Curated annotation (Swiss-Prot):
Keywords: Ribonucleoprotein, Ribosomal protein, RNA-binding, rRNA-binding. One of its GO terms (molecular function) is structural constituent of ribosome. This is Large ribosomal subunit protein uL18. It comes from Streptococcus thermophilus (strain ATCC BAA-491 / LMD-9). Belongs to the universal ribosomal protein uL18 family.
Length: 118
C-alpha cells in the first residue's frame, strides 16, 4: 500500500532547495517565515554575519487577538516597522517552503504595505 507523504518533510525539502539559491546580506537581508499550527514567526536575517536583525511573531503582546490570518497581517506590519526602524528597506523573501497563499501571503502583503520592498 502507498503511504501518504509527510507534508512537513516535503516542505523542508522545498525549503532546503530554495535556500541553496537564496541568502541574505547586510544590504539586503532575508525575511524568513515559519508557520506553525498556532502561530506565525518572521525574522529579518543577515546570513553573512549570522545575525537576526528584526523579528516578530504571534507571541508578541501586540498580536494576541483575531484569526490566524489577521495575526499574520499584524506580524507582517510589526516586522516591517522594526526593520525600517533599523534602516532596512529591501529584503529577500524566504517563504520557508510554504505555498505563497493564505497566512504567508497576508504577512508578505502587510510587510510590503509597511515599507519593505521585495
Amino acid at each position: 500500500m502507498i503511504s501518504k507523504p509527510d507534508k512537513n518533510k516535503l516542505r523542508q525539502k522545498r525549503h532546503r532547495r530554495v535556500r541553496g539559491k537564496l541568502s541574505g546580506t547586510a544590504d539586503r537581508p532575508r525575511l524568513n517565515i515559519f508557520r506553525s499550527n498556532t502561530g506565525i514567526y518572521a525574522q529579518v536575517i543577515d546570513d553573512v554575519a549570522g545575525v537576526t536583525l528584526a523579528s516578530a511573531s504571534t507571541l508578541d503582546k501586540e498580536v494576541s487577538k483575531g484569526t490566524k490570518t489577521e495575526q499574520a497581517i499584524v506580524v507582517g506590519k510589526l516586522v516591517a516597522e522594526r526593520a525600517v526602524a533599523k534602516g532596512i528597506s529591501e529584503v529577500v523573501f524566504d517563504r520557508g517552503g510554504y505555498l505563497y497563499h493564505g497566512r504567508v501571503k497576508a504577512l508578505a502583503d502587510s510587510a510590503r504595505e509597511n515599507g519593505l520592498k521585495f
